[in-house]
Amino acid sequence: MRVIFILFLYLPYFIFSQNETDYNITINTGEAWDANIFYKKTGTPLRPVIILNSSGEELFHEVWPMQGNDFKINDNNKITFYDLETDGWMVMDSLHNIVDSVYCLNGYVADPHDFIALENGHYIMFAYDQQPYAMDTIVEGGDPEAIVEGLIIQELDADHNLVFEWKSWDHFH
């Protein structure tokens, strides 16, 4: 009876911890891209971030439950990805050590879809800013109490000082 109990106790772990890769390379000719491929497939069950070489061999495979969006080599030749737990961007060296973390300033939350780490050490991030806006002043029948999303672009230097900020709202009024 104890063995059955232990089996049922650990069964979900064995079922949901499987992170088998689910891809097939069907064509790989000499004209194919000859570089590593970085990706993370999202969804349930949790899937790993993966680096594949051009032959399809896994070079890196690790499950990061709340991290890994936009997993790529950036312009500064470092690996970057978004962390959903902290709402910021992580920067890794070639040994997969986190060497920096970057967040939007002035109360904004970085968007998880794109991040530019420049060669000069600067970072560019995007954020959204929701504001009430009387859309009935723009279009006939518009909602006078609409919530409209504006865009924020921030550039931070290597010390995370704000050196540039653009707000789409500055161009609405």
Which ranges hold each PLM region?
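Bacterial Sec-dependent N-terminal signal peptides
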Residues: M1-E20
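Histidine-/acidic-rich catalytic cores in large beta-rich domains
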Residues: Q18-H173
